[in-house]
Amino acid sequence: MSDAMKNPAGTLGARLDALPLGTWHKTLLFVCFLGVMIENYSQITLPLAMPVIIGQWHLKPFMIGVLISASSLGLVVGALVFGILTDIIGRKRVFILTTVVYSVFAALSAFAADFTQLYVLRVAAGLGLGGFVPVGMAFVSEFSPARYRGRFTAIFSIGNGVVYVLAVLASMFLVPASPEGWRWVLGLGALGLLLVPVIAAALPESVRWLVSRGEIDRAAAIVDQLERRILGAPTMERAAAIAEARASAPSPAGGRSGLAGTRALFGKDLWKHTILAMIVWFVASYTFYGFILWMPSFLTQQMGYELTKGYWFTLVAALVGTGTPALVVGYASDRIGRRRTMSLCMAAYAVFGLVFYWLGGYSILFLYWFSSGMASMTYVYTPELFPNRLRGTGIGFASSVGRFASFIAPMAIGLIVAAGGLFGVLAVNAVLLAGGIAAMRLLGAETKGAGI
């Protein structure tokens, strides 16, 4: 069987997969990398500023969790709505729209006068952040050649770690500098507006999405343009390419996208993939955000570190967990497969959680490393579980479950800490991670090297 016939996007998808890596691929990855950095900045900075806000607004532990979870509530809705929308109006438009929504409300949150205002603005900013995840993952996976997709998507996820380091640095210098320093930290989220003209100029619409919508002429023109830029000339004449693409591409009538498409996620062909993606996102999000976002408070309140020392320790952990986990798991997933790599990350995260409780100190670095590797694998694996016409909807649906987990995790952990301390938090994490490993074994399909 030819590559074109095996590729769900037909000959145009096969031509994309056949392209050697070029400057254009790196530009695409860099723009999406900036997007994930900018749109995750707000998710990270509030917990870092929280020790000061607690003192100024006299917040109780449960209210701390509520405020930390605010953007996650917006993430749940944003992932669902914008995930569906990206399959209806396209990846590029939603990329721009989510960036604007996030940046505007992130800027406004810096001017919040009280708990209620900050909560509402954080929820609104979360709408944009939740919407970016489906479109960003779809963009990178749909333009990455199959043989490099694991590494490319994992590198895209490094933006989460890089921005964590930058957010910690900004918080270290700005938050203690003045009583209003935390406002400057939150307000820096407005820099996302600078990315909008870059997206408009640098990124084309997804070829695979266009093919799934039957817009073969536009898709063929983009592939010709990319081949001309990377190879020097198109590999096929336009008329012949369009004719062959029409013959090999799936019919747009073969499945619906948008609201009607959500039912297809639980049809006989996709239900296992959908349930698995939901479980993976819930486990990864709860255990990652539930622990990592509480790390500054654990270090300062549970372990007695002073504020500056707690920031430094958080910074070291973030540096260790930035870059190398995504690079290693991305390479491993292209070598030994997605399922095995994800399962290994989950198992190691559970083990080192208990090691951290017993030994403390720098064992937290291993904990952060494997949690970051697990988070990166959700970005690699999820887009490959869904067909082109439903990829945004599928990612949005699964990530909304993850965002719900990240919404309840800080509040749940606040209650668990009060009842069982740090050990209780890490024990619950270990149970959830064991469930994730079981789901990978029972429901997981290996997607390494598959055409999408």
Task: Name each region found by the language model.
Residues 1-452:
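Transmembrane-helix signature of 12-pass secondary carriers
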